[in-house]
Curated annotation (Swiss-Prot):
One of its GO terms (molecular function) is tripeptide transmembrane transporter activity. Its main location: membrane. One of its GO terms (cellular component) is membrane. It is found in: Membrane. Keywords: Membrane, Phosphoprotein, Transmembrane, Transmembrane helix, Transport. This is Protein NRT1/ PTR FAMILY 5.6. It is a multi-pass membrane protein. Gene3D superfamilies: MFS general substrate transporter like domains.
């Protein structure tokens, strides 16, 4: 009985420690174990969400009107403008792969956010200067046709500085925000599930403000005034983020995340001829008390050949300590390598969705320019059509969080309602519907080009709204999937993987436009992409994309069914 009482007391002490302290290897601002009541959770996340709002405000204030700027101020033709938008969008959303790597391996997420946001701010300052300094200002449209070279150079340097800033800001900030919630604490784990939804509500609020207030200022007042506003808001949010420093929980960078992956492959190949042990528990693993830099993972049968990296050749404790990490690795390191391999097919099978998403900021906006934008006595700025997407996203996320998740949870017994990959797949179906609607509307618009009165821009409302539903399911699902399904030490890179879907899709979109354009000219003698929309056949391109997405959904279903989820060993307090 005494032994049982002692055991119960130890468990109670462990539980009490978990309630008081955060024991997930994070640190407070002074390098100590964080006190749960004073750090992290929503008290810290709100500071982080504030800077995300301002970053999305700045990004979409520029991105949604970029094609308009290139075709009107810089006088680029449609194909050149779309290519430049896609190149910039591609670089902006691929740069997080580098930023996430630097954050996880060397600088840490907090420091990376500070450095990246400073670079972002430099880009905004240069952009604003290019509209006010006489030597850099664009020439007036009525005075000259050719754009002023100095302005063009300053403009592109500025927007690519913003790309570099986004590269460090986006993956680090979102993963830093999620780090404020302890996965081993029941209440905080529930909060974390809500965090990604409310993160996206804040993101949408930034987008909504950008495509209404900022777009109106750019359209009616001037790009320079809009630049001043965006620069000031970003500077204020950086100060707010810095003020939250005492409340944050920090994770120390763990070195290059690529080295352990390479070590697993080298060790598995070196021991390829050894037999598998009779029981997975015989594979090399450290105890929970020894492992303080993260969480231990459970063994999975998937990619079993990599298990050989954890086969113990000499069970002598002294020999184990001296064993090279290129010869023997823990089971957790092996499972982390499997996780990286698992996300690769998911990444590829979501690229078609990314291609659909890129249309909203390019061709959808260009369609709006050619249509009647008068509603009552008000002229709608083209970029303000994104208001419908942002509102749909906010409403659908709120309904999903407050109504659908509790309902689905009671049916499926899954804390998320449905699993992450099911959520992603649902959004892909909405993206298919978006392309079908867009094709039908564009055909209707082309049929009316000979009429004196153009179609109302309201006809574009359905495609802007349905893509909002697609984003609510797929984009948010991708954020959760890549954050949770990569090793804990690679979470900034995990967010970068999600962003890189859009980045790679932007470049693929350019390749598709070029390939489809060439094929159309060879077979029919007429390009699908003329100098303007009225001389193009954008409806056919949309039907082509609908076919690509439909085929991709079938591939995604097959991949998703075979893809296992991360399996974490319960902590001592929870077990």
């Amino acid at each position: 009985m005494e032994h049982k009482n002692i055991g119960a007391e130890v468990l109670q002490d462990t539980y009490d420690d978990q309630q008081k302290w955060v024991l997930d290897s994070s640190l407070d601002s002074r390098g100590r174990v964080p006190l749960r009541a004073r750090t992290g959770a929503w008290r810290a996340a709100l500071f982080i969400i504030a800077i995300e709002f301002s970053e999305r405000l700045s990004y979409f204030g520029l991105a949604t009107n970029l094609v308009v700027y290139l075709t009107t101020i810089l006088n680029q033709d449609l194909k050149m403008a779309i290519r430049n938008v896609n190149y910039w969008s591609g670089v902006t959303t691929l740069m997080p792969l580098l930023g996430g790597f630097i954050a996880d391996a060397y600088l840490g997420r907090y420091a990376t956010v500070l450095v990246a946001t400073t670079i972002y701010l430099m880009g905004l300052v240069l952009l604003t200067m290019s509209w006010f300094i006489p030597g850099l200002k664009p020439c007036h449209q009525e005075v000259c046709v050719e754009p002023r070279k100095a302005h063009e150079v300053a403009f592109f340097i500025a927007i690519y500085l913003i790309s570099i800033g986004t590269g460090g800001h986006k993956p680090s900030l979102e993963s830093f925000g999620a780090d404020q919630f302890d996965d081993d604490h029941v209440e905080e784990r529930k909060m974390k599930m809500s965090f990604f939804n409310w993160w996206n509500v804040s993101l949408c609020a930034g987008i909504l403000t950008a495509v209404t207030a900022v777009a109106y200022i750019e359209d009616r007042v001037g790009w320079g005034v809009a630049g001043i506003i965006l620069t000031v808001v970003m500077a204020i949010s950086l100060i707010i983020f810095f003020i939250g420093k005492p409340f944050y929980r920090y994770r120390t960078p763990s070195g290059s995340p690529l080295t352990p992956i390479l070590q697993v492959f080298v060790a598995a190949i070196a021991k390829r001829n050894l037999p598998y042990p009779s029981d997975p528990s015989l594979l090399h693993e450290v105890s929970k008390t020894e492992f303080t830099s993260g969480r231990l993972l459970c063994h999975t049968e998937h990619l079993k050949f990599l298990d050989k990296a954890a086969i113990i050749e000499d069970k002598n404790p002294l020999a184990l300590e001296k064993q090279s990490p290129w010869r023997l690795l823990t089971l957790t390191k092996v499972e982390e390598t499997k996780l990286i391999i698992n996300v690769i097919p998911i990444w590829f099978s979501t690229l078609a969705f990314g291609i659909c998403a890129t249309q909203a900021s390019t061709f959808f906006i260009k369609q709006a320019i050619t249509m009647d934008r008068h509603i009552g006595g008000f002229t709608v700025p083209p970029a303000s059509m994104f208001t419908l997407t942002a509102l749909t996203l906010i409403i659908s996320l709120t309904v999903y969080e407050k109504l659908l998740v509790p309902l689905l949870r009671s049916i499926t017994r899954n804390q998320r309602g449905i699993n992450i990959l099911q959520r992603i797949g649902t959004g892909m179906i909405f993206s298919l519907i978006t392309m079908i609607i867009a094709a039908l509307v564009e055909k209707q618009r082309l049929d009316r080009t000979n009429n004196n009165k153009p179609m109302s821009v309201i006809w574009l409302a359905p495609q802007f709204m349905v893509i909002g539903f697609a984003d609510a399911f797929t984009l948010v699902g991708l954020q959760e999937y890549f954050y949770h399904q990569v090793p804990d030490s690679m979470r900034s890179l995990g967010i970068a993987f999600y962003l890189s879907v859009i980045g790679a899709a932007s470049f693929l979109n350019n390749l598709l436009i070029t390939a489809v354009d060439t094929l159309a000219e060879n077979f029919s003698g007429k390009s699908w992409f003329g100098k303007d929309l009225n001389s193009s056949r954008l409806d056919r391109f949309y039907w082509f994309l609908a076919g690509v997405i439909a085929a991709n959904i079938c591939v995604f279903v097959i991949v998703a069914k075979r893809c296992p989820y991360k399996s974490v060993q319960p902590s001592q307090g929870l077990s």
